Structures are given as C-alpha cells and as structure tokens.
C-alpha cells in the first residue's frame, strides 16, 4: 500500500483508468461480435448499420490509444472482406 499522498492519488487514478479502459475494450469486443453474428446469419440490413457503428468506435478508441491503430484497421479490413463476400 502506498504511504505517500501523491502515490496514493496515483494508485486511485490508475485504478479508475483501468476500469474505464477495460469497460471500453469490452464494448469494442461486443460490437465486433455483433457484426460477426450478423455476418453468420447473413442479415444484410443489420450488417451495414452495425459495421458502420463498429468502424466509428474502433477509430475513436484507436485515436485515443486504447487500441493500436493497426489493430483497428486490421479488424475493419477483415470484416469488410467478409461483408463484401456476402454481398456478391
């Protein structure tokens, strides 16, 4: 346990940030699952809406360095390839 006041504050701040980051990463994973499930079910209506929403979220959190920008673009690229294959 921290004894110095500033280190106590820092540990509290890091715990808050850890909870925030984990919730946002969980949200990202759930949006990716939502898109993948709609791809598996071949629901063309929901695929576009959920994919656009997922792209926006990935870009937002890549910009804030919550996930790496290359990971965000890789996820978007892989899912867009699957979507293009369905719409053929």
Curated annotation (Swiss-Prot):
GO terms for cellular component: cytosol; small ribosomal subunit. This is Small ribosomal subunit protein bS20. Residues 1-22 have a biased composition (Basic residues). GO terms for biological process: translation. InterPro entries: Ribosomal_bS20, Ribosomal_bS20_sf. HAMAP family: Ribosomal_bS20. It comes from the Bacteria. Residues 1-26 are annotated as: Disordered. GO terms for molecular function: small ribosomal subunit rRNA binding; structural constituent of ribosome. NCBIfam families: S20. Binds directly to 16S ribosomal RNA. Keywords: Ribonucleoprotein, Ribosomal protein, RNA-binding, rRNA-binding. Belongs to the bacterial ribosomal protein bS20 family. Pfam families: Ribosomal_S20p. It comes from Wigglesworthia glossinidia brevipalpis.
């Amino acid at each position: 346990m921290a004894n110095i006041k500033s280190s106590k504050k820092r540990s509290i701040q890091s715990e808050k940030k850890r909870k925030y980051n984990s919730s946002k990463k969980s949200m990202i994973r759930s949006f990716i699952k939502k898109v993948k499930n709609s791809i598996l079910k071949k629901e063309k209506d929901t695929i576009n809406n959920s994919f656009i929403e997922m792209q926006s979220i990935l870009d937002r959190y890549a910009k804030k360095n919550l996930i790496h920008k290359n990971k965000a673009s890789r996820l978007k690229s892989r899912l867009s390839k699957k979507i293009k294959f369905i719409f053929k």
